[in-house]
Structure formats: C-alpha cells, structure tokens
Amino acid sequence: SQDLSIVESTTKMLLKRCPDSIIILKSTIVPSALSKLLKISRNLIYNPEFLREKYANEDFVNSPMIIFGGDRNIAEKVSKLYLDHSRCVNKDHIFTDLLSAALIKYSINTFLATKVIFFNEIKDIFEQLDVNDSWEKIIRTISLDLRIGSSHMDVPGHDGRRGFGGACFPKDSLAFAKCAKELGCELSVLTAAIKTNNKIRSQYKTLDKRES
C-alpha cells in the first residue's frame, strides 16, 4: 500500500490548528488509501491534477476537466474558490464521491501509460516493414480516429527515449496495479505494460531518479 505518512501527519496538523478545515488533496492517491484518510477527517476533497510536467501551468489553466471528489456541499465551496479566484478556463466542474475521483485519475494515467507501450510496440512493427511513409504520418493518420486521440503516440517520447518515464506514469502504474491486487482484482494489461516498459527503460544507463 502507499506510504501516506506525510499526508496523514499534515492532515492531523491542519485539523489540530483548525478542526473545521476543508482539506484539498492534489496528490495522486489510490482509492483504498483515501478510504483510510476519511477516518481522520470527513472534510476531504480530492481534486486531482491532469498536468504534463513540461506544460504544468498551461494545463492547469486549460484543464478539460476539473473534478472535486467528496461531500457535495463541501466540494461546491471549493468549486466556488476556483471560480472566484483562479484563471481556469473550464467552469463546468465535475462532482463525484472521493473514491470515484481517485478511480478516474488512476484510470486516465494508467490508460495513457499503456497507450505509450502499445505504440512503442507498433513502432517496432513499423521498423520491420518496408514502408515509404514516415512514422509521423502513420500516427497522424491513426489519430484522425477521434476514439484514439493524438496524445502519447510519439516514439521516442518527449524525453527522447522509448517507453514511459518521469514523475507520474511509473509510480502510478505500479500503485494502481498493487491496489487492484489487494482488492482481489487483476489489471493484466497494465501489468504487462509495466513489464514491457521496465524492459525498454532498462537499456538506458541514466534514468530520472523518480523512476527507480
């Protein structure tokens, strides 16, 4: 399970100073772990971020969805805070329960991680075929199918390497796979993607420390 010691201690400290505090969580926390935090305070709102590291400010302001998970009355207060005091373009906020917000966040991140690996393997096929068109044309054409979208198809990725790395996808994929296992469920596709990614990334001598 995730180590929530810092989150728990910070939450308790805030409640000690102000018992009626509304606590907004931005960190990516698996649903089962959030259940434990509810025992500390019912005034929790989970407001997950959907940011690319390279474009964090831009993505925050232009996020296609802003989710508030938790008690509806409390969540609406946080929503009003956004509406009154932020430059976020999206005004159509989404309200869910706490655990649903976490499930949505992890589903998106791990799907995109799996998508990265899928297109890494399609690139392997591309490189073995005697084709005249470029990889860029291939993925650009595939992306015209709106069901697939155009993101996370570049091989290599934005870091110049194959597979997925950085601060989010590796840790989120492992955490969600472990969460599923603890719940008696199996994320076989994600588990296979993690295994393939580990094999791909192992060829690089230097990696972001956050991947280890």
What are these regions (language model features)?
Residues S1-S212:
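Structural/interface elements that position substrates and couple domains in central-metabolism enzymes
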